[in-house]
Swiss-Prot record:
First-level EC class: ligase
Active site, per annotation: K75, S150, S174
The gene coding this protein: gatA
UniProt name for this protein: Glutamyl-tRNA(Gln) amidotransferase subunit A
Pfam families: Amidase (PF01425)
Catalytic activity entry: L-glutamyl-tRNA(Gln) + L-glutamine + ATP + H2O = L-glutaminyl-tRNA(Gln) + L-glutamate + ADP + phosphate + H(+)
Superkingdom field: Bacteria
Oligomeric and partner information: Heterotrimer of A, B and C subunits.
Entry EC no(s): 6.3.5.7
Gene Ontology cellular component list: glutamyl-tRNA(Gln) amidotransferase complex
GO terms (BP aspect): translation
Length: 483
């Protein structure tokens, strides 16, 4: 059952008020977030004001949309007018955007209640949310472990029931990997389906905004609300947005599922492999035909990504110069102001990626690195195109492991980067993909199944994800934070 629909019905039947729902969400945050640290800031006054508007509409007999009165967390790299937006970086400490991002604007119009801005790896660069310039978010299933990243705050908040749904951004796996590690549904839409206007850029050709939820149907409802063309984003797709919930069916008769064989093997935990194989068997039980698919360049994605993404980041992050907003370091002249501010304001991982990108784009190395990486990107896209001539949807693990201990990989960037081995190729190809819970390991840590669709294949992903969810009970399990 959709949690959004259930709450929506209670609201319109006036069994509960939107203000009471908002207060319950805020109380939950107050009760558990000192341990979790999912939120960088809680926007209680704005949440109550929005909820009061929804209650007034209901009292006046006006119709309300499905998201009206629903508590939502917003990743803190999405601009919110009049509300501090930091990207979890000291360089943007205290920055208040003068405008609203397209997605948050749409959510406001839909009546959704933003309860706060969620933590992330600084500028969305990381796989554990340990790179935040402010705090480290814990995994609700085991507070000594990471929630994944970079959208770890959003994933943890939804898993811990601090909010019903949340928004994240996904550049190389930043929605799907934390969704897997926190046991929730996370979706990265087709590149261009959701406007990036107001999303603070990391790698512009890869970034995409998407939903977190505890049910597939709720993710579909949230995507429905934020998708659509926007003239303020030149990469926005001008395509009709279907009603994604119409695609939800309890069986998979006639659906062809391809298993990405290249995702299995070295680096994959045995428990993750077992859970995913069991999930694939369940898809077959539901009526799908299963076929082995080879994407020969699948594992080359990570090498190409760590040239392309830092290159774009080095250009995008050049704008933080301390002139108009954010941190400004003391200096005797302009050049010193730039260098001192950036040295002080950016964290180690952001500096690492800026340097990598600047190097890859430099004269004499551009052809050897950046151009070659773009060629590999094209080949990866061709592999996926070839696969989708045979099947409707592809499956593989979302992440090679379950949640690792905080601090375990901070001194080993390469090991950390491998957390996104399965998710990165999808971003390089601009495809939609979703992680759905498919099991737990021996430590009671969640495992995610990644579903990959063709361009604009969101309906098929929701269909497969929903059918699998209906046939299993993984989504019913919740972390115990009562201690």
């Amino acid at each position: 059952m959709s949690l959004i629909r259930a709450l929506h019905q209670q609201l319109i039947d006036q069994e509960i008020s939107a203000v009471a729902v908002a207060q319950a969400s805020l109380a939950r945050i107050e009760a558990v977030d000192d341990r979790l640290k999912s939120f960088l800031q809680v926007t209680a006054p704005q949440a109550i004001a929005q909820a009061e508007k929804v209650d007034a509409q209901i009292a006046a007999g006006e119709p309300i949309g499905l998201l009206a009165g629903i508590p939502i967390g917003i990743k803190d790299n999405l601009c919110t007018k009049g509300i501090v937006t930091t990207c979890a970086s000291q360089i943007l400490r205290g920055f208040v955007p003068p405008y609203e991002s397209t997605v948050t604007e749409k959510l406001q119009k839909a009546g959704a209640v933003m309860v706060g801005k969620t933590n992330l790896d600084e500028f969305a660069m990381g796989s554990s949310t340990e790179n935040s310039g402010y705090q480290v978010t814990a995994n609700p299933w085991d507070l000594t472990r990471v929630p994944g990243g970079s959208s770890g705050g959003s994933a943890a908040a939804v898993a811990a029931d601090e909010c019903l749904i949340a928004l994240g951004s996904d550049t190389g796996g930043s929605i799907r990997q934390p969704a897997s590690l926190c046991g929730v549904v996370g979706m990265k839409p087709t590149y261009g389906l959701v406007s990036r206007f107001g999303l603070v850029a990391y790698a512009s050709s890869l970034d995409q905004i998407g939903p977190f939820a505890r049910r597939v149907e709720d993710a579909a409802i949230l995507l429905q609300a934020i998708a659509g063309h926007d003239s303020r984003d030149s990469t926005s797709l001008d395509v009709p947005i279907p009603d994604y919930t119409q695609a939800l069916k309890p069986d998979l008769k006639g659906v062809k599922v391809g298993v990405i064989m290249d995702a299995f093997g070295e680096g994959l935990d045995d428990t993750v492999n077992e859970a995913v194989q069991t999930a694939i068997a369940k898809l077959r039980e539901l009526g799908a035909t299963i076929e082995e698919i080879h994407c020969p360049r699948f594992r080359s994605g990570i090498a190409a990504y760590y040239v392309i993404a830092p290159s774009e980041a080095s250009a995008n992050l050049a704008r933080y110069d301390a002139v108009r907003y954010g941190l400004r370091a003391e200096a005797d002249n302009l050049m010193e102001m730039y260098t001192h501010t950036r040295a002080k304001g950016f964290g180690a991982e952001v500096k690492r990626r800026i340097m990598l990108g600047t190097y890859a784009l430099s004269a004499g190395y551009y052809d050897a690195y950046y151009l070659k990486a773009q060629k590999v990107r094209t080949l990866i896209k061709q592999d996926f195109d070839q696969a989708f001539t045979k099947v409707d949807v592809l499956v593989c693990p979302t992440a090679p492991t379950t949640a690792f201990k905080a601090g375990e990989k901070t001194d080993d960037p390469l090991s950390m980067y491998l957390s996104d081995l399965m998710t990165i190729p999808v971003n390089l190809a601009g495809l939609p993909a979703m992680s759905v819970p498919c099991g737990f390991d021996d430590n009671n840590l969640p495992i995610g199944l990644q579903l990959v669709g063709n361009v604009l294949g969101e309906e098929m992903l929701f269909r497969v994800g929903y059918a699998y969810e209906q046939a299993t009970t993984w989504h019913d399990r919740q972390p115990d934070l009562s201690a």
